[in-house]
Amino acid sequence: FNYDASETLFGDRDRIVSAEIRGGYGKFMGRIPRVWYGNAYSRSGGLSDYVKVYGHDSTLPSFRCGGTVGPMPAGDPSFFWMGASSNYCIPSSPYFNDAQVTDPDFEAPQSWRGNLALDLVTAGGYKLTLEYNHDSVDQAVFYKELGLTRESIMADGRGVYSHGPGDFMLTNTGEGGAKATSFSVQKSFDNGLSMFGSWSSVSAEDVYPLTSAQAESAYGYTQRWDGENVPAARSSFMADSKIVVGLEYRTMLFGDNETRVSAIYINKSGEPYSITFDNSSYSPIGGTGYSAFRDDYSLAYIPTDANDPKVVFTSASVATDVMNHINNGPLAKYKGTYAPRNAFENPDYDRLDVRITQEIPSFMEGHKFLFYLDLLNVMNMLDDEQGRIFEYGYNTSRQIIADAMDDGRFEIKGVDPDDSLYLQDNDGQSRWQIQMGLKYRF
């Protein structure tokens, strides 16, 4: 809806030229990645052996079924499901003998979303917008491991689980949602200067971050405390706050050829991350043997002190190092329990980009050249310690080095304060760049 509230709210105030209230509410559903459904076809529980049915070298051994892999039929994808019976077997290990299924009642992810906004235009030409958005999950994705069985309980209350061959079911959860508040202002001045500024604050929760295509990876690479008791927690993709400021100046230094200088500054809080156990034995805490859970994705129990009965430190020096790390950082508030998923934040990030453009006359009427110069990440250009993004890989920091003991306690072997903290620069986002070019307009 849109409602002109100029007279209702500001009829007796000359400083407000117009006021509009707008909003809406409804159920929204986006596109569904087909790979979610594809898992049930690629891992049907049949007698196929992925290693045996194809290969670039027909002499390569098939480690699951014996014999050789056999040549891949060139240009014929049907061999995946119509191969000769000799290419099928019951694997000797369960790795590819799993069945991944889709709940017959599965519904595509959908949310109830609503927003309410107030747009103002002042007598001075300022445009102001205040907006609130609310998102409540109706159906989201949840994965279940159908063979999961709790075998015992550890000292902090989490279960220890065994499982079958890894049979995963794609189903739904109703948990999750988001709230966002934003404010923006923009103004153009008569002297060629214009400006824009905005601030936003977001609180978002989800259950599975869904960063992987395969069901076992989406399931396993989710930080958890107790089996499939995975409540909605802070989303790995949210930024608590973000500030954007833009300035632009236009003038004509010679003739009717425009000179434009633009700058945009961004400051945003870092993405959330979890602190987990670093499982030195490569056996996930909370799982037994070959587990559906992934190593190093068990949320860490935080000892109360060096004498905590739920843990065993391998030495006095290890106890001192670990407790110093806990007491002098954000883990201190979680002593005696575990730190929830995504309870911590990566470092904030600042960035400044500048663009300069200049029109240049051509020899033909109506034709012009446009020269442009981009200065990207100016803060890093001025100081190589600025303008850099540091994040924990997969939103996980494996800081407490530990293994599970047979009596349910945790054997703590050390601490790694910045495990998995990386400089993110795959796309050049943490380095300065200069680029220039020339366009011809006609």
Regions found by a protein language model. Name each.
Residues Y3, Y25-R31, H134-D138, S201-E205, ...:
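Transmembrane beta-strands of outer-membrane beta-barrel pores
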Residues S86, R260-F363, L370, N395-Y422:
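Extracytoplasmic gating/loop element in the C-terminal half of outer-membrane beta-barrel translocons
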